[in-house]
């Protein structure tokens, strides 16, 4: 089980990403667009660097929705491989069956 501080940090980052997503996307579009003049591009880079570091999507980590485990997360279910196996064997995941061939 992940520490509560890690889960709260992740939640704070998710909020920042959602809040700054439009602004960040617009600035990145200005920076990467080939027709943007140099002064506007420099200004966009400067404004982009002033945004909060945690507002970038790459700072997010996929975590198990139940216990917050950071590794081995199956994104389709939002569960770690360990939790997925436990729940699947108990029949708690609809439509999931153990493979047999």
Swiss-Prot record:
The keyword RNA-binding applies. It comes from the Bacteria. The keyword Hydrolase does not apply. One of its GO terms (biological process) is translation. One of its GO terms (molecular function) is structural constituent of ribosome. Keywords: Ribonucleoprotein, Ribosomal protein, RNA-binding, rRNA-binding. Belongs to the universal ribosomal protein uS14 family. HAMAP family: Ribosomal_uS14_1. Part of the 30S ribosomal subunit. Contacts proteins S3 and S10. This is Small ribosomal subunit protein uS14A. The gene is rpsN.
């Amino acid at each position: 089980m992940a520490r509560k501080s890690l889960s709260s940090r992740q939640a704070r980052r998710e909020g920042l990403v959602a809040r700054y997503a439009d602004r960040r996307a617009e600035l990145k579009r200005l920076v990467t667009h080939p027709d943007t003049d140099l002064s506007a591009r420099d200004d966009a880079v400067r404004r982009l660097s002033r945004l909060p570091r945690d507002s970038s999507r790459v700072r997010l980590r996929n975590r198990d929705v139940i216990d917050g485990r950071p590794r081995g997360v199956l994104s389709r279910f939002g569960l770690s491989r360990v939790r997925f196996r436990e729940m699947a064997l108990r029949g708690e995941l609809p439509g999931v069956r153990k493979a047999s061939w």
